[in-house]
Amino acid sequence: MARDNGNKDRDGKRPNGGRNRKMKRKICSFCMEKSESIDYKDINKLRKYVTERGKILPRRISGNCAKHQRELTIAIKRARNIALLPFTTE
């Protein structure tokens, strides 16, 4: 029985040209600034972490650490509740 290697093309080569790429780790911007807390009234900073459809960017895309991602989520939800940020855009 032939074994199927899921990461190889039909001709036996790797799809990315045989190069192994390591992704550069993103650094939490809030840790770099050494900010104590994330303010829900700072709309310009919060908008960087919300998509144009109104969804909160995940940690793997935003590059935040777990602690600041949780604080950011709470701040965005608070800003939405008092109508500083929209829930969705149409």
From Swiss-Prot:
Gene that produces this protein: rpsR
Keyword Amino-acid biosynthesis: no
Function text: Binds as a heterodimer with protein bS6 to the central domain of the 16S rRNA, where it helps stabilize the platform of the 30S subunit.
Family: Belongs to the bacterial ribosomal protein bS18 family.
GO molecular function annotation: small ribosomal subunit rRNA binding; structural constituent of ribosome
Protein name (Swiss-Prot/TrEMBL): Small ribosomal subunit protein bS18
Keyword Ribonucleoprotein in annotation: yes
Subunit structure: Part of the 30S ribosomal subunit. Forms a tight heterodimer with protein bS6.
GO CC term, one of those recorded: cytosolic small ribosomal subunit
UniProt keyword terms in alphabetical order: Ribonucleoprotein, Ribosomal protein, RNA-binding, rRNA-binding
InterPro entries recorded: Ribosomal_bS18, Ribosomal_bS18_CS, Ribosomal_bS18_sf
Start-end of Basic and acidic residues biased regions: 1-14
GO biological process, one term: translation
